[in-house]
């Protein structure tokens, strides 16, 4: 399943038509009781960005989100896997426990591979059930079967708890 089909209202369809389509370099892979996100990019930064957008794409149609507000997220870890975990968890916090922020786009500004720190920014708005279609709630990020492949075209595999 490459994309989730959500029933959109005419208003949501009109909103999607206002902006160019979002490039999606992620897919959802079946996993028992959970969902695995497989993301990729031309760089590790892009693979991280796409992984975050894959997580948000499971919760709503991100093309119905308008880039009204900006949120910055800084995360750190002890290795690349924990950095990815905290990066996704910090973005999930912005949605579920902080300001209900849903991004249309996430951009990684810098990954410090020596100190395992990442700076990122997202453009979006506050989630509104009246404006955005409701997908499936993401409860948590997991370390289970987490993989980061730093090849010519980096790939990431992450299981999210739904």
Curated annotation (Swiss-Prot):
Coiled coil: none annotated. One of its GO terms (molecular function) is metal ion binding. Transmembrane segments: none annotated. It comes from the Eukaryota. The keyword Lipid metabolism does not apply. It holds the Pfam family Archease. Ca(2+) binds at residues 34, 161-162. One of its GO terms (cellular component) is tRNA-splicing ligase complex. Component of the tRNA-splicing ligase complex required to facilitate the enzymatic turnover of catalytic subunit RTCB. Together with ddx1, acts by facilitating the guanylylation of RTCB, a key intermediate step in tRNA ligation. Component of the tRNA-splicing ligase complex. This is Protein archease.
């Amino acid at each position: 399943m490459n994309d989730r089909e959500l029933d959109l209202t005419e208003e949501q369809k009109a909103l999607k038509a206002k902006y160019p389509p979002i490039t999606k370099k992620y897919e959802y892979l079946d996993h028992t009781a959970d969902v695995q996100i497989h993301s990729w990019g031309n760089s590790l930064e892009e693979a991280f960005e796409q992984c975050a957008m894959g997580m948000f794409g499971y919760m709503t149609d991100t093309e119905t989100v308008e880039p009204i507000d900006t949120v910055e997220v800084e995360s750190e870890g002890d290795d690349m896997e924990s950095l990815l975990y905290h990066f996704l968890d910090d973005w999930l916090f912005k949605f579920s426990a902080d300001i209900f922020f849903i991004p249309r786009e996430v951009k990684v500004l810098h990954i410090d591979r020596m100190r395992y720190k990442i700076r990122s920014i997202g453009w979006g708005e506050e989630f509104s059930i009246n404006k955005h279609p409701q997908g499936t709630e993401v409860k948590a990020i997991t370390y289970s079967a987490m993989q980061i492949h730093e090849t010519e075209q980096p790939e990431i595999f992450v299981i999210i708890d739904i």
